[in-house]
């Protein structure tokens, strides 16, 4: 491994416990050096939350650290190995352009990974150059921070540094490195890798590390690996329900993009739905709609079944019994997902308690929204405001009948209309990272080096549930529909 310039580490207390795992799970790898560095965007609030020195990170040494030009003393950067099912096909993968610099403990004792994306080739790069484009890294920064503002578990973005490099794709583009923060980068694909290429002892070592890092041992009795499986199923059911509730389409739900921590990861071909349509697909390579908006819950359980398969040797010594345990756990996913999603949809309609007829109320509204091509976000925010003039569907006889049924449902509960409105305000964002506004910010940044448009967008995305000062510019529905917007796996 090539020697790197060292920064005397008086600012960040990084560890790397991952290297205590079997060595086939990673490769020691320094980031590549870049010709020039410019700190394009820096997340001061995240740095503060993590207890990081903002002064150091914005200094010359700090920017060199964030670009990969320098590493901290006594740290061992690594690239992680993993496998995965990509569009249903199993393949060997790994960090092809990402380097894990280390782990830090936040002020409340929680452990986080610090990873550089676009930091050069690794042993897992296959034919790639290991680099990333400025546009793709800024896009991940915007959308991941938007997801955080929406209250959805996600990896975070600490900084983007432009590198002065030309990155060759279909055209020559500006290069950049993004600093990603995650509770960990352990994926379903990590378990698939060790299950296929390691021993049972190595699988157990990974599972034990995961339990120690993400779950409290005191919380379970009996077989800890059954507990691990059940907790991952629960966290993924909850995560995907949150995606559905805000109209988020991930676009590349391969098993290597399913985190054990329950965080959203990989913002390549993702986007937010404008017009409500379960068949919405944005990814240019998802030609069969495998990862369409309406398919995401089903893909979630498919991915979790792949995770359960990796744990079979740890669930029970008898294979038949292990399979039965796994199937029993997986069978709980549907009820868990429906519980989280219906609870969320009731909240979007100001409903506190549960009644069976709520399902029909919710589904009939969604059916109307699809037929009238209603904007998903604005339908619910306008219902929250009581504004029934801005959406064509609201003038229909069918909607007026639905509206009366909904109002009667609200009257049937103990909470007041004001309490229902407050619940709706907490559940229905007025602002999402709309595709047209994200693109507008990226064009200004990349073509004109004007980052003010992006900063304005980031500012409003911090408070998407603020009904006291709605910024209409960011809530206007674009004239073109969701179907015309295409995304690419740039990140």
Curated annotation (Swiss-Prot):
Q: Which cofactor does it need?
A: Mg(2+); Mn(2+)
> Does the keyword Nucleotidyltransferase belong to this entry?
yes
Catalytic reaction(s) noted: L-seryl-[protein] + ATP = 3-O-(5'-adenylyl)-L-seryl-[protein] + diphosphate; L-threonyl-[protein] + ATP = 3-O-(5'-adenylyl)-L-threonyl-[protein] + diphosphate; L-tyrosyl-[protein] + ATP = O-(5'-adenylyl)-L-tyrosyl-[protein] + diphosphate; L-histidyl-[protein] + UTP = N(tele)-(5'-uridylyl)-L-histidyl-[protein] + diphosphate
The alphabetized UniProt keywords are: ATP-binding, Magnesium, Manganese, Metal-binding, Nucleotide-binding, Nucleotidyltransferase, Transferase
GO MF entry, a single one: AMPylase activity
Q: Which Pfam families match?
A: SelO (PF02696)
Q: Where is the active site?
A: 256 (proton acceptor)
Q: Mind telling me which PANTHER family this protein's record contains? A: PROTEIN ADENYLYLTRANSFERASE SELO, MITOCHONDRIAL
Q: Which HAMAP family match?
A: YdiU_SelO (MF_00692)
- In Swiss-Prot or TrEMBL terms, this protein is called Protein nucleotidyltransferase YdiU
* Organism from which the protein derives: Clostridium botulinum (strain Alaska E43 / Type E3)
Source organism phylogeny:
Bacteria, Bacillati, Bacillota, Clostridia, Eubacteriales
């Amino acid at each position: 491994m090539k020697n790197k310039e060292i920064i005397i580490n008086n600012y960040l207390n990084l560890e790397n416990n991952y290297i205590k795992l079997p060595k086939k799970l990673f490769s020691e790898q320094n980031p590549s050096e870049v010709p020039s560095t410019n700190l394009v965007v820096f997340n001061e609030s995240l740095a503060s939350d993590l207890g990081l020195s903002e002064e150091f990170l914005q200094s010359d040494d700090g920017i060199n650290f964030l670009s990969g030009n320098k590493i901290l003393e006594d740290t061992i950067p690594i690239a992680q190995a993993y496998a995965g099912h990509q569009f249903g096909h199993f393949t060997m993968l790994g960090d092809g352009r990402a380097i894990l610099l280390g782990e830090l403990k936040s002020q409340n004792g929680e452990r986080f990974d610090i990873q550089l994306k676009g930091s050069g080739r690794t042993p897992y790069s296959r034919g790639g150059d290991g680099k990333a484009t400025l546009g793709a890294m800024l896009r991940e920064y915007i959308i991941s921070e938007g997801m955080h503002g929406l209250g959805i578990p996600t990896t975070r973005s600490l900084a983007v540094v432009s590198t002065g490099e030309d990155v060759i794709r279909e055209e020559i583009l500006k290069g950049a490195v993004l600093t990603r923060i995650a509770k960990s980068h352990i994926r379903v694909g990590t378990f698939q890798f060790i299950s296929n290429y390691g021993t049972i002892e190595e699988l157990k070592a990974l599972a034990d590390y995961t339990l120690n890092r993400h779950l409290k041992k005191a919380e379970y009795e009996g077989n800890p690996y059954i507990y691990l499986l059940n907790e991952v199923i629960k966290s993924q059911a909850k995560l995907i329900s949150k995606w559905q509730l805000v109209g988020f389409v991930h676009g590349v739900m391969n098993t290597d993009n399913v985190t054990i921590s329950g965080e959203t990861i990989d913002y390549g071909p993702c986007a937010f739905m404008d017009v409500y349509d379960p068949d919405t697909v944005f990814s240019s390579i998802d030609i069969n709609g495998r990862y369409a908006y309406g398919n995401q819950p089903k893909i979630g359980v498919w991915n979790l079944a792949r995770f359960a398969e990796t744990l079979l040797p740890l669930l029970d010594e008898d294979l038949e019994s292990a399979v039965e345990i796994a199937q029993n756990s997986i069978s709980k996913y549907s009820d868990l997902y429906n519980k989280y999603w219906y609870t969320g949809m009731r909240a979007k309609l100001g409903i506190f308690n549960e009644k069976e007829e709520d399902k029909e109320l919710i589904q009939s509204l969604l059916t109307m929204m699809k037929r009238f091509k209603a904007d998903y976000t604005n339908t619910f925010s306008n219902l929250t405001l009581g504004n029934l003039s801005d959406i064509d569907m609201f003038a229909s006889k069918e909607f007026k009948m639905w509206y009366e049924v909904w109002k009667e449902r609200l009257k049937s509960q103990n909470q007041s209309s004001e309490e229902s409105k407050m619940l709706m305000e907490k559940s229905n964002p007025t602002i999402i990272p709309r595709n047209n506004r994200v693109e507008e910010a990226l064009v200004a940044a990349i073509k004109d080096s004007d980052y003010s448009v992006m900063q304005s967008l980031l500012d409003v995305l911090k408070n998407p549930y603020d009904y006291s000062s709605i910024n209409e510019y960011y809530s206007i529905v674009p004239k073109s529909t969701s179907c015309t917007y295409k995304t690419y796996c740039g990140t």
